[in-house]
Amino acid sequence: MKISDLESFEPFLPQGAVVMISSKQHQLKALYRRFEHCQNCSLGTQRQNLVFGEGNPESKVIFIGEGPGEEEDLQGRPFVGRAGKLLDRMLAAIGLDRSDIYIANTVKCRPPNNRVPAPEELNACSPLLQEQISIIEPKFLFTLGKTATHSLLPLQDPISQMRGNWYDYPPIPEIKLLPSFHPAYLLRNPSAKKAAWHDLQLLAAELGNPQKKPSHL
């Protein structure tokens, strides 16, 4: 398959990826087409791009963040700013890169001034995220920060208490969910990186990935 054949799949493939198109990719493409002009909440009228998500649809794990920032909105890709660079280092520390995982957010359009998504915005995007999870059928969800964690679990405890513990994902209990800190939080609070490294080790152990202690996250 030629690279040109994959151009319409760019919203959910890693940048530069050349792979055979699977059934899951076809389903994700159809899902993207359903929502690409979504205006189910006010965020849809203000965005530059819908940040659908990207990565390996055959992945065992989905990393789920809060929502797009300025750079993500401009490029239409998740985690491409400073927090994204830190996420790349976090993945590398457990032997992964973006081609090994899938990355999504709880909301697909940028909230103004990068504020926390409002409940009605989370509710509007929830069906899309739920369908992404159902299509990919991961074994694990790694939630980054309180917004992603609280939106997927019927719990509202502080992320500092929830991180590092495994939970059943309520719609599909066979999928296990592990909360951790959002990379943007780690940039503001470097002292939390030790706890985040512990969380990554828990995930790596379940994935069977080699772990190497990073010189820094």
What residue ranges belong to the model's regions?
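A polyanion-binding, active-site-adjacent surface
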Residues: 1-217
